[in-house]
Swiss-Prot record:
Its EC number is 5.1.1.3. PROSITE patterns: ASP_GLU_RACEMASE_2. It is an enzyme of class 5 (isomerase). The gene is murI. It catalyses: L-glutamate = D-glutamate. This is Glutamate racemase. Provides the (R)-glutamate required for cell wall biosynthesis. It comes from the Bacteria. GO terms for molecular function: glutamate racemase activity. The lineage of its organism: Bacteria, Pseudomonadati, Pseudomonadota, Alphaproteobacteria, Hyphomicrobiales.
Length: 277
């Protein structure tokens, strides 16, 4: 398989949080081109009704797979994958989907206090998938689920360079910090790919030090294990394409994409198709 024959890797998120996963995946798969897809027309996913979101994502992937023909798809969005992952695999059995789920298992393995918090969107918190992970891997721990209504939007603003009030951020993360029977929360799972961009802010504002668990590297390792590595490959240079379902990313977003080595495609998903999403 030559370099020109290698199919790209599709990285999908509701917004720009999936860039945390893209960054790690590029390190592990330097021989591949990537296509970043942001469903910003539907952002944020956390407040969507489940049936409507499921229908939207499945239909969108039907078009993306037909047009882009990727090697695999990385769903860099906890909210989407915990809801739609099984349905995507059933609808498109020829495609390999690498999912993003709350990193509850590694958190349970690392905690010393037994107090773990999961910072997520409301959608991820209410999924049976998330509670099944807790039952399967963290039944011996006290796991607090914290569903933030605002933090994904705040993270998008922060990534674009907007200033955020410390008090507003603290109000979102403070419920993660639990004290019980002389013990304290020692791990917070970042169960939204937007949140790691704000990890330094979280550390600065945290009532006490904790391990902020970012799953991006583990997701990238899983993807690498599923993608064939050709002999004699050379690392690729140049920009990769980015697709926004709104077709209208603002200037700050375009500049951010350039910083990640991405160029925004003007007409990768045609307007008439977007209207039917």
């Amino acid at each position: 398989m030559t370099k020109t024959e290698l199919k790209p890797i599709l990285v999908f998120d509701s917004g720009i949080g999936g860039l945390t996963v893209l960054r790690e995946a590029r390190v592990l798969m330097p021989e591949r081109h990537f296509i970043y897809v942001a469903d910003d027309a539907g952002f944020p996913y956390g407040g969507w009704e489940e049936g409507a979101l499921k229908e939207r994502v499945i239909a969108l992937f039907g078009r993306l797979l037909a047009e882009l023909d990727p090697e695999i798809c990385i769903i860099a969005c906890n909210t989407a994958f915990t809801l739609v992952g099984a349905d995507l695999r059933a609808a498109y059995p020829q495609m390999t989907f690498v999912g993003t789920v709350p990193a509850i298992k590694p958190a349970a393995e690392r905690t010393r206090s037994g107090l773990v918090s999961v910072l997520a969107t409301p959608g991820t918190v209410k999924r049976a998938y998330t509670r099944d992970l807790i039952q399967s891997f963290a039944s011996q721990c006290h796991v607090r689920l914290v569903g933030s209504e605002n933090l994904a939007r705040m993270a998008e603003a922060y990534i674009r360079g907007d200033a955020l009030a410390d008090e507003a951020v603290l109000a979102e993360i403070e419920p993660c910090f639990v004290e019980a029977e002389g013990k304290r929360t020692d791990i917070v799972v970042l169960a939204c790919t937007h949140y790691p961009f704000m990890s330094n802010v979280f550390r600065r504002l945290a009532p006490w030090p904790v391990d902020w668990l970012d799953p991006a590297e583990a997701i990238a390792r899983r993807a690498r294990s599923l993608v064939p590595l050709p002999n004699g490959f050379e690392p690729l240079n140049g920009e990769d394409p980015a697709i926004f379902t709104s077709g209208r990313p603002d200037f700050a977003t375009r500049r951010l994409m350039q910083g990640f080595g991405l160029r925004v495609m003007a007409d990768a998903v045609s307007a008439d198709r977007r209207e039917r999403i």
